[in-house]
């Protein structure tokens, strides 16, 4: 950005998007029923079908018999045929009874949804500029599994709350999910590390103070 604007790097301040932490109260222990979660628009670009495929693979491996899939997010009339296609896929695999699909949640419903997840994944097909849903999952104390593209590497590496996989590796997501689900205690510890990182670096209350400091810094130094 500094190069594009032809200004000194010392003149640039990084100020990420943030969230209000009110209501985010992560569980201290792993959920009784292991649950893989998705919270984003229910559309191909966000990779919902890729997550459904990964879930089917995990179930068919025989290592995750009690694993459930919880899907939530915005859904428009345009998205309905795609979502119906995922339902058919899950029905054919004999797994539809272990899957919940809850479109268009309000904030309180979203908070409760996130609290009950063991691991969170949105395998977006394009590089996300940020991905607020990742910050929300981490704030809820849920470890994340994401493609190594866009803003995801920076968020995951800063928060230490999840795993990245090569988006060109068809098995990368499934293997990363499997490794987290195999060790619930380590997964919960990873999620709590992510929660603490979000509280420190992405809370709106702290970001507001940081923004004021960034604005006033040139004035005070002149």
Where are the regions a protein language model picked out?
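Short hydrophobic beta-strand element within catalytic cores of glycosyltransferases
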Residues: 143-146, 156
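Carbohydrate-associated surface elements
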Residues: 18
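Glycosyltransferase donor-sugar binding loop
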Residues: 68-87
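Conserved acidic donor-binding segment of nucleotide-sugar-dependent glycosyltransferases
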Residues: 158-159, 163-170, 179-184
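Conserved donor-binding/catalytic core segment of Leloir-type glycosyltransferases
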Residues: 28-46, 52-56, 70
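Nucleotide-activated donor-binding/catalytic signature segment of Leloir-type glycosyltransferases, i.e.
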Residues: 83-105
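Acidic donor-binding loop of glycosyltransferase active sites
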Residues: 115-129, 142
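A short, well-ordered alpha-helix in the C-terminal region of glycosyltransferases
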Residues: 172, 179, 186-201, 207
């Amino acid at each position: 950005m500094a190069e594009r604007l032809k200004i000194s790097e010392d003149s640039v301040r990084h100020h990420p998007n943030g969230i209000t932490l009110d209501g985010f109260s992560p569980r201290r222990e792993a959920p009784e029923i292991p649950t893989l979660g998705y919270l984003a628009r229910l559309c191909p670009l966000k990779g919902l079908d890729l997550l459904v495929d990964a879930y089917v693979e995990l179930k068919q491996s025989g290592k995750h018999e009690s694993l459930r899939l919880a899907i939530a997010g915005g859904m428009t009339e345009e998205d309905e045929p795609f979502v119906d296609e995922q339902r058919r896929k899950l029905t054919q695999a004999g797994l539809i009874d272990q899957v919940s699909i809850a479109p268009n949640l309000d904030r309180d419903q979203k908070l409760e949804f996130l609290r009950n997840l063991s691991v969170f994944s949105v395998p977006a097909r394009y590089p996300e500029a940020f991905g607020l849903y990742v910050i929300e999952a981490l704030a809820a104390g849920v470890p994340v599994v994401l493609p190594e593209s866009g803003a995801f590497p920076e968020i995951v590496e800063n928060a230490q709350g999840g795993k990245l996989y090569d988006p060109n590796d068809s098995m990368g997501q499934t293997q990363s999910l499997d490794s987290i689900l195999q060790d619930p205690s380590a997964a919960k510890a990873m999620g709590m590390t992510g929660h603490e990182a979000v509280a420190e670096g992405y809370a709106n209350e702290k970001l507001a103070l940081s923004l004021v400091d960034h604005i006033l810094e040139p004035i005070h130094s002149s």
